[in-house]
Amino acid sequence: MTPLIAVLFAILQGATELFPVSSLGHVVIVPALLHWPIDQASPSFLPFVVMLHVGTATALLLYFWREWWAMLAGLLGRGEPGEVDAQRGLLLRLVVATLPAVLIGFALKKPIQHLFASPEIAAAFLIANGAVLIIGERLRRRRAGNGFGIGQLTLRDSLVIGLFQCLAFLPGLSRSGSAIVGGLTRGLDHEAAARFAFLMATPVIAGAAVIEVPHLLHHAAAARGMFGTALLAAVVAGVVAYLSTAFLMRYFRNHDRWALGPFAAYCALFGALSLILIPFGA
């Protein structure tokens, strides 16, 4: 993989990881359409992907550092009693929401792994992702009121959102999009749903990197050969992820009616075009 392709791949991953358009779907489809010289079976590819995850998780941690710092302070019992309880409650909700991804991820990783290499399957699921986003908006409109904040989530709500997030184990279904839709169905407004989804993403993305550490050590020699390129890509992915998060939080703050609509239309259009073009690019 050349440095240019590595940077382009990092930009693609860093942006689509947070936008509700499926990073996994894009990193399968786009290289196939553009004939990027990427060998996903290469021993050096896994370390490269792990570094991208590290960059993205770091960006999320930096953007939401105040929230994580407040939760840490609450866990340690520092602050006013009411604030301590609120922060401990938020941390517990995030733990509950993350558990389904951990448990289901281990169970489904091998059975569905063969789907990850198919651009056609990813494109079909990308169209399905657009449908999921539209369904989420319709369900949101049926709920009374304007939506509430994270502090009003119950543990059951958190578990449901975590289960929605697990849809993203299928390539083409967005992790952030599924989690946001889960939040909307439980009554959150768009900004609160996005904030909770992005807070959930930090341990999930970091965990995805940690899980691959044994394989990373196994291919340590190959990793050393492209460490500089992988480090550059991690920085690029982190910067793009940070900017994407800032944009999306501002977007959802200012749009609480059909905010997922443009992303749904994009997914349907790009998925359909990909299904048409991929056979000609093979």
Curated annotation (Swiss-Prot):
Sequence intervals crossing the membrane: 7-29, 45-65, 89-109, 115-135, 153-173, 196-216, 229-249, 258-278
Note: Bacitracin is thought to be involved in the inhibition of peptidoglycan synthesis by sequestering undecaprenyl diphosphate, thereby reducing the pool of lipid carrier available.
The protein's enzyme class: hydrolase
Taxonomic superkingdom: Bacteria
Signal peptide: none
Membrane topology: Multi-pass membrane protein
Main location: membrane
Taxonomic source organism: Acidiphilium cryptum (strain JF-5)
Reactions this protein catalyses: di-trans,octa-cis-undecaprenyl diphosphate + H2O = di-trans,octa-cis-undecaprenyl phosphate + phosphate + H(+)
Subcellular location as annotated: Cell inner membrane
Keywords of this entry: Antibiotic resistance, Cell inner membrane, Cell membrane, Cell shape, Cell wall biogenesis/degradation, Hydrolase, Membrane, Peptidoglycan synthesis, Transmembrane, Transmembrane helix
EC number(s) given by UniProt: 3.6.1.27
GO BP term (any one): regulation of cell shape
Alphabetized HAMAP family for the sequence: Undec_diphosphatase
Assigned GO CC terms: plasma membrane
Protein name: Undecaprenyl-diphosphatase
Cross-referenced InterPro entries: UppP
Similarity section: Belongs to the UppP family.
Upper classification of the organism: Bacteria, Pseudomonadati, Pseudomonadota, Alphaproteobacteria, Acetobacterales
GO molecular function: undecaprenyl-diphosphatase activity
Function in brief: Catalyzes the dephosphorylation of undecaprenyl diphosphate (UPP). Confers resistance to bacitracin.
